[in-house]
């Protein structure tokens, strides 16, 4: 039953990634957020042509870990759905449909010059506040032209960039007093605390 519950939670999270252009998730540690995101990013790249997917992780080691999970998932894919690969490196993966996945540590210059179709920020609350602010300021105009964004993190500070986006995502009353499905910043918020993990003891 715990495995079924875990799979159901992952499906719900995948649905949140897919159904909303912008989503932000506040999640406890060991909740499967990186693994779930890796699966979704791989699917998105293989089944949507000419996409540039950027992984911006808290640290370079985190970016590499997500890419490792993506490569592992790719190798496990059945032949009939596995897209051809034209470049297979530690920091990037390029497919024969023109899509690519790039993994980098988050700096103020990450993603600069790229036309990003899908941005995934991992453990965004733990990026140094000044860097996170500069990064978000520089990357936001790119997303405004039609890109998707997925942000996941465990919470850290009350006034960092992650907290600001989370706060905006939870303000769902517009200027006319109507309740919206997404926040005033366009983000859909999702939250799961540590004791909701099916393997945790109550």
Q: Model-derived features: where do they sit?
A:
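Walker A/P-loop
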Residues: 19-41
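Conserved Walker A/P-loop ATP-binding site and its immediately adjacent core
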Residues: 50-72
């Amino acid at each position: 039953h715990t495995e079924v519950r875990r799979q159901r939670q992952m499906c719900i999270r995948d649905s949140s990634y897919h159904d909303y252009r912008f989503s932000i998730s506040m999640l406890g540690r060991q909740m499967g957020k990186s693994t779930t995101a890796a699966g979704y990013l791989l699917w998105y790249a293989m089944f949507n042509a000419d996409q540039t997917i950027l992984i911006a992780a808290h640290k370079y080691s985190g970016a590499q870990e997500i890419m490792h999970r993506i490569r592992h998932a790719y190798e496990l894919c059945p032949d009939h759905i596995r897209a051809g690969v034209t470049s297979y490196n530690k920091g990037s993966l390029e497919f024969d449909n023109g899509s690519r996945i790039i993994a980098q540590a988050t700096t103020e210059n990450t993603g600069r010059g790229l036309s990003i179709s899908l941005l995934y920020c991992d453990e965004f609350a733990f990026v140094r506040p000044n860097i996170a602010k500069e990064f978000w300021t520089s990357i936001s105009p790119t997303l405004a032209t039609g890109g998707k964004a997925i942000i996941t993190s465990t919470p850290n500070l009350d006034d960092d960039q992650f907290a600001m986006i989370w706060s905006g995502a939870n303000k769902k009353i517009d200027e006319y007093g109507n309740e919206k499905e997404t926040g005033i910043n366009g983000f859909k918020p999702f939250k799961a605390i540590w004791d909701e993990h099916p393997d945790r003891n109550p």
